Amino acid sequence: MFEQRVNSDVLTVATVNSQDQVTQKPLRDSVKQALKNYFAQLNGQDVNDLYELVLAEVEQPLLDMVMQYTRGNQTRAAQMMGINRGTLRKKLK
């Protein structure tokens, strides 16, 4: 049997190539590619609040999945995320 080890320091994204092989790449590589695509579509236009845009795209799925993983346990979710439970509650509203 294959043993799958999880490196808790690196988030990965599974991708399927043209030969139907599944590969893992760091999430940061996917973020870089998404930003390259975004900048290419700007055609020289100025952009404001890019930091907020990226955080909004990442934060909500993070909250959703952590809450699902902890089965709604806010204390455990806050501990997993390394934030105060009160902060988590505000973000969930």
Curated annotation (Swiss-Prot):
InterPro entries: Fis_DNA-bd (IPR005412), Homeodomain-like_sf (IPR009057), HTH_Fis (IPR002197), Trans_regulatory_Fis (IPR050207). Residues 74-93 bind DNA. One of its GO terms (molecular function) is sequence-specific DNA binding. Keywords: Activator, DNA-binding, Transcription, Transcription regulation. One of its GO terms (biological process) is regulation of DNA-templated transcription. Activates ribosomal RNA transcription. Plays a direct role in upstream activation of rRNA promoters. Homodimer. Belongs to the transcriptional regulatory Fis family. NCBIfam families: PRK00430.1. This is DNA-binding protein Fis. It comes from Proteus vulgaris. The lineage of its organism: Bacteria, Pseudomonadati, Pseudomonadota, Gammaproteobacteria, Enterobacterales.
